Amino acid sequence: MVNEYKKILLLKGFELMDDYHFTSIKSLLAYDLGLTTKMQEEYNRIKITDLMEKKFQGVACLDKLIELAKDMPSLKNLVNNLRKEKSKVAKKIKTQEKAPVKKINQEEVGLAAPAPTARNKLTSEARGRIPVAQKRKTPNKEKTEAKRNKVSQEQSKPPGPSGASTSAAVDHPPLPQTSSSTPSNTSFTPNQETQAQRQVDARRNVPQNDPVTVVVLKATAPFKYESPENGKSTMFHATVASKTQYFHVKVFDINLKEKFVRKKVITISDYSECKGVMEIKEASSVSDFNQNFEVPNRIIEIANKTPKISQLYKQASGTMVYGLFMLQKKSVHKKNTIYEIQDNTGSMDVVGSGKWHNIKCEKGDKLRLFCLQLRTVDRKLKLVCGSHSFIKVIKAKKNKEGPMNVN
């Protein structure tokens, strides 16, 4: 099935831009897509579209273009048109999702026997115990009984997660955003991740069968984390780079730690990609690559570069962030701690909860962040710790990193 949002991105977006605006968009996307100067010069509209589809899957790729283009006055009409086309696709998907429901309702009227779902199984069994003649004579009674069954089932259902929202995109909807009514000291612990959010992440996890050869740039020591699916476990983060791009990596198989040594060249296969981050699990394969392999310095520079805070405010909610930031202020609350990070372009709050609540650090220290997520809290974009997040403190005076060493 054709990705409708990708189709709009290319045909109604890039193809209708002049070269100047397309070049401007490529420049703004350079960090997210890992584009070198040469890539920015050579990559055409189709290539950039393919990269955006991979990096920002589903509706997120179109949202990204709208986010960048809306600040360009001459592209106002194009942005409005993109929003209209996006709305059309969302309505189309919503209609398709409703279609099976309508069919079931028709079948319940008497066109055919409905599929044995949890809801209609009770009513169909009840009808089976009523003679046909009696069914025809007491339609009102049957409707009353069906309503009673429906209410009973709904009352027996566990309450759904409040405030959770999903997008119309079928393969990569944006992360549910925190309600604007959430207080700033709300604790975002792993246990509060709803089932709906975990299902969204599962849909985003895209298997990658093609092997990729990379050089290891850095890796953290293993650390413990807790998730609703796996309970307590151990993982580590790494950054690797191929000849054309770099990857942030989550490694869930600790036995592979010896493979992730700085400057070591390895080949990775059977991995998956979730929210733009490579994930390596027990089913993945990591092997040594014993041939000459050189990565352009430009790729390494981009991989090690920390994004500017002003640039983070332009990213979509749900974006994963890595980097080294200066701590300006620390505010400890009952359930979480707000770490205010700052650079020469602005400041942003980091919401630390769970094991990252009130860590030992002070103004002037540097925080190396791994896998924190941009989320909207109180109508303001903030960095929020998740179950796979990791924060390393680099003390200002001693100029030494915290207990976790980087290879």
Swiss-Prot record:
GO molecular function: double-stranded DNA binding
Protein name: Myeloid cell nuclear differentiation antigen
CDD domains: Pyrin
One Gene Ontology biological process: positive regulation of apoptotic process
Keywords from the UniProt entry: Activator, Cytoplasm, DNA-binding, Nucleus, Repressor, Transcription, Transcription regulation
Location relative to the cell: Nucleus; Cytoplasm
Presence of the UniProt keyword DNA-binding in the record: yes
Tissue: Expressed constitutively in cells of the myeloid lineage. Found in promyelocyte stage cells as well as in all other stage cells including peripheral blood monocytes and granulocytes. Also appears in myeloblast cells in some cases of acute myeloid Leukemia.
Induction notes from the record: Strongly induced by alpha interferon which selectively affects expression in late stage cells in the monocytic but not the granulocytic lineage. Induced in vitro by dimethylsulfoxide and 1,25 dihydroxyvitamin D3.
Basic and acidic residues bias: start-end ranges: 139-148
Biased amino acid composition, Low complexity: 177-190
Domain Pyrin per the UniProt entry, residue ranges: 1-88
Membrane-spanning ranges: none
Region (Disordered): 108-207
Stated role: May act as a transcriptional activator/repressor in the myeloid lineage. Plays a role in the granulocyte/monocyte cell-specific response to interferon. Stimulates the DNA binding of the transcriptional repressor protein YY1.
Keyword Transport: no
Motif stretch (Nuclear localization signal): 131-137
Originating organism: Homo sapiens (Human)
Subunit record text: Participates in a ternary complex with YY1 and the YY1 target DNA element. Binds nucleolin and nucleophosmin/NPM/B23.
Source lineage: Eukaryota, Metazoa, Chordata, Craniata, Vertebrata
Domain writeup: Its N-terminal half (200 amino acids) is sufficient for maximum enhancement of YY1 DNA binding and a portion of this sequence is responsible for binding YY1.
Domain of life of the native organism: Eukaryota
